[in-house]
Swiss-Prot record:
It is found in: Cytoplasm. Pfam families: Nitrate_red_del. Keywords: Chaperone, Cytoplasm. Belongs to the type II DMSO reductase enzyme chaperone family. InterPro entries: DMSO/NO3_reduct_chaperone, DMSO_Rdtase_II_chaperone, TorD-like_sf, TorD/DmsD_chaperones. This is Selenate reductase assembly chaperone protein. May function as a system-specific chaperone protein essential for the assembly of an active selenate reductase SerABC. GO terms for cellular component: cytoplasm.
Length: 193
């Protein structure tokens, strides 16, 4: 993970990989995940899809793990979270996909936005422009959103016997590496909650 710390482009790749992992695993997604080594090819598409549904949609007799920030932070009210996220996206003119139709507080949407901020930072540095606005935005977004609900999400995910449980620590490490790079003074993810 150390190679990620000083490289916003690598951080973006990490966020996009995690976004792929936590996206619905249709046949095409499963192929991409296995080709990139993100999922063991021994785990068939059908099995991965069943694992996804059991973990995030139906529970399979257990409580599901929500992929939505607003459902992981009910004390704040989902409407307020959605409005704040939309303001973040709108400020940077980031458009939500018309095809996916995911809510702004979906884990994948938040991961993709952080990847976009990292890529904007990388482009600014490459082009000799000020990258600090993108760093500040990423720091603020992490503090207000992903890092704020990730501990509870991870706790619940890692308590499942799902194939997805293995990705909780990797996602946590990615976020911590990014926060460390940004000089974050907030508590570590394990200290939150």
């Amino acid at each position: 993970m150390n190679a990620l710390i000083d490289n916003p482009e690598a951080l973006a790749s990490g966020y996009l990989a995690m976004a792929q992992v936590f996206s619905y695993p249709d046949a095409g997604a499963w192929s991409r995940l296995t080709e990139r080594g993100l999922v063991d090819p021994a785990l068939t598409h059908e099995t991965l899809e069943a694992e996804y549904l059991a973990a995030f949609e139906m529970g399979g007799g257990k409580a599901t793990v929500s992929l939505y920030e607003g459902q992981n932070r009910p004390d704040l009210g989902r409407d307020g979270i959605l409005q704040e996220l939309l303001r973040f996206y709108e400020f940077f003119d980031a458009q939500l996909s018309e095809d996916d139709r995911e809510y702004p507080d979906h884990l994948v949407t938040e991961l993709e936005f952080l990847a976009w901020l990292c890529l904007q930072e990388h482009a600014a540095v490459r082009d000799g422009r000020d990258a600090e606005p993108f760093r500040r935005a990423a720091r603020d977004f992490l503090d207000r959103h992903l890092a704020a609900w990730l501990p509870e999400f991870r706790r619940r995910l890692e308590a499942t016997d799902s194939a997805y449980a293995q990705y909780g620590p990797a996602l946590g490490e990615l976020v911590e590496a990014h926060r460390s790079r940004l000089g974050e003074q907030a508590p570590q993810l394990g200290e939150l909650q």
